[in-house]
Regions:
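Juxtamembrane/disordered regions of integral membrane proteins
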Residues: 1-139
Length: 139
């Protein structure tokens, strides 16, 4: 595939995919789900979330989600995935190779609990399955 596919990419799909990842992260790391254990394992003071720096974190997360959605759409186009299932599979392969594989041993080297890996990797697994499926059918 050559670079000409850039003109045919659905930029709205990339934006919606990034928004889904960002909203999923807001829910995943909220007090309703995993905020307490995640913060405790990282030694984060819950009061930190009330500071101005939280805004910069949210903005940088969304920008990263935009980049990830753009790259994921490239993988989907290159693989010619065109159904929800094949797109989710591309998302799974991306998660396995680029999220789980490097982060699991890194957590071991850093002496971090497996539960922390499971929370973080679980977020990316769900996010990449959903956005992979979405981008494949709405590319």
């Amino acid at each position: 595939m050559d670079i000409h596919h850039l003109h045919h990419m659905n930029h709205l799909a990339i934006l919606v995919s990034a928004l889904i990842l960002w909203l999923l992260g807001a829910i995943w790391y909220s007090p309703a789900l995993f905020a307490k254990p995640w913060m405790a394992m990282l030694g984060i003071n819950p009061e930190h979330g009330k500071h101005k720096s939280m805004v910069y974190g949210m903005i940088s997360s969304f920008l990263g989600d935009l980049v990830l959605s753009f790259v994921l759409l490239h993988f989907i186009l290159w693989s010619e995935a065109s159904s929800w299932g094949t797109g989710a599979f591309v998302g799974f392969i991306g998660w396995l190779g680029f999220i789980a594989a490097p982060n699991f041993p890194q957590g071991i080297y850093e002496g971090r609990p497996f539960k922390l890996f499971a929370i973080n990797a679980g977020y990316w697994l769900v996010g990449l399955l959903v956005t992979g499926g979405l981008l494949a059918v709405w590319r």
